[in-house]
Amino acid sequence: MNYAIEKIDENNHSLFDDMVFWREHGYEREPSQEPVSEQIKKELLNPDLYVYAVKVDGRYVGWISCVYIAKVGKWKGHGHVYVDELWVEPSYRGNGFAKALLKKADELKDKFNATGIRLYVNVNNPVAKNLYEACGYVEDGRAIFMEK
């Protein structure tokens, strides 16, 4: 299957928005040229956020979002790339798209000379855990995930 990985920018916000709609609602809508909300544009144009999408047959079918956070002190400015979200539409899974998207995190690690890449995975999502392990990620076990 032919595909391309594209960085999300102001030229492809509407296609990205269509994919987010697909994920949230479970069905695909007609491709739109509708303007994306100003809030979404603002978030997607954040220079610290890196969003890439897989494009197949003119539409996006998956994405990864990453951030780089520099560290001070013992890290000497070499922080980590954090994978915030990785998703591929279920009917497109098994084509290597998630692995291709994770390579974008590797590229960011190299770009920033980062110490490493960090992500979290839900304990109830063994498929994702297996994917990450197949891509070289290892369970660290030294952190507790907390939210407020």
Q: Where are the language model's segments positioned?
A:
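Short coil/turn motifs at secondary-structure junctions
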Residues: I69-K71, S91, N124-P126
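Conserved GNAT acetyl-CoA-binding A-motif
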Residues: L102, K109-Y120
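Acetyl-CoA-dependent GNAT
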Residues: Y3, K7-H78, Y82-D84, L102
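Short, Lys/Arg-enriched, disordered terminal segments
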Residues: M1-A4, E107, K111, K148
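Residue-level recognition of the GNAT/N-acetyltransferase active site
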Residues: D84, E89, R93, N122
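Conserved acetyl-CoA-binding loop-helix of GNAT-fold acetyltransferases
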Residues: V88, G94-E107, N130, A134
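Conserved residues at the C-terminal ends of beta-strands
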Residues: V67, E89, Y120, A143
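Conserved active-site alpha-helix within GNAT-family acetyltransferase domains
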Residues: K99, V123-R142, K148
